[in-house]
Structures are given as C-alpha cells and as structure tokens.
Amino acid sequence: MTIHHDSLPEIGPDTKQTWRRTREDHSAGGVAYRRLAESGVLELALIATHGGQRWQLPKGSCEAGETSVETAIREVEEEVGLLTVNEQFLKSIDYWYWDTYRKEVPELVHKVVDFYLLRMIGGELCDDSYEVDAVGWFTPEQALKMLTFGGEQSVVQMASDVLSDK
C-alpha cells in the first residue's frame, strides 16, 4: 500500500488515536549566543535547512545514554561548530508531524524538544554539517522574524527575556 504524501490527513485528535504507525521522538537543542565585546550586541546562532528555506535552532535526537543537555551541546557543536556551556534550561516544546522520508507508509511522530540557553565559549560558526544549508548570527529581533516555527520563536523570546536581565 502506498500513500501519496500530498494526501496525508491533517493531524488532529482522531489521527493521533487511529494512525497505526506512530512513534515518540525526544530531541534537544540550544539557543547558542554570544555578546559582541565592543558593542555588547547580543547574537543568536540559527541554521537553515530545506535548501535554505527553513530557519531554525540547532537541535537533534538524543543518543542512548546521553542526557538532554548533553544532546543540546553536542548538536550545537555538530550543526554550527560552536563550543558552548549550558546556562539554563529554557523550555520544552512538542509537536506532531508526518515523517515521510524514505517511507512507503508515513509515520506520525510526536516530537518533544528540550531547549537550553547555551553560551558560546569557543569554536567558529560554520555550516560543515550535511544536515545544514547555511548558518548565521542574528539579533533576537532578526531571529524572531526569520524562524519558521512558532514553538522555536517562543523559545527565542524566552532566551531574549532572560538575557536582557543579564
């Protein structure tokens, strides 16, 4: 049986209860930041995926035996080349999506992502990861306009609020 991806049902309560192929995914990511020494300007690292069309925070799936914060720090280093330290947990977001990558029958995925505020301590911003099309430093205001997903916008807003108090 092949399901055409353009005919997938909208995800709603009924879909979540009746779709047979579902899975849970736990990921973690970070709001990696730096403050420019001369001007004091705050900048956040974002990545672009899907041909540069989707701007988002660096994140990825937790590996076996890894804590959520360890995942966030590892993913930021892998995806944007930065060494960071955790300053604090920000929040978790969750959402549902259709995983159609290399699948004859799509899976309905419930994803939970833990986000941390990560201060840059080394490394250099780069887009060497095969998963990333572009990277960049952006002010919180710029990042809020560029981010594709509302959940990540709420994370950046929270990080901006925390950092404005420092």
Regions found by a protein language model. Give the residues of each.
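Active-site segment of metal-dependent pyrophosphate-handling enzymes
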Residues: G81-G123
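Short, charged/polar surface micro-motifs in flexible loops or helix N-caps
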Residues: L36-S39, G51-R54, E63, D94-W98, ...
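Conserved Nudix-box catalytic region and its N-terminal flanking loop in Nudix hydrolases
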Residues: S39-V85
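Short secondary-structure boundary/capping segments
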Residues: T22, E107-L108, C126-D128
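Acidic, metal-coordinating catalytic segment for phosphate/diphosphate chemistry
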Residues: T2-E38, V105
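A general structural signal for short secondary-structure boundary/capping elements
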Residues: E75-V80, F89-W96, M158-K166
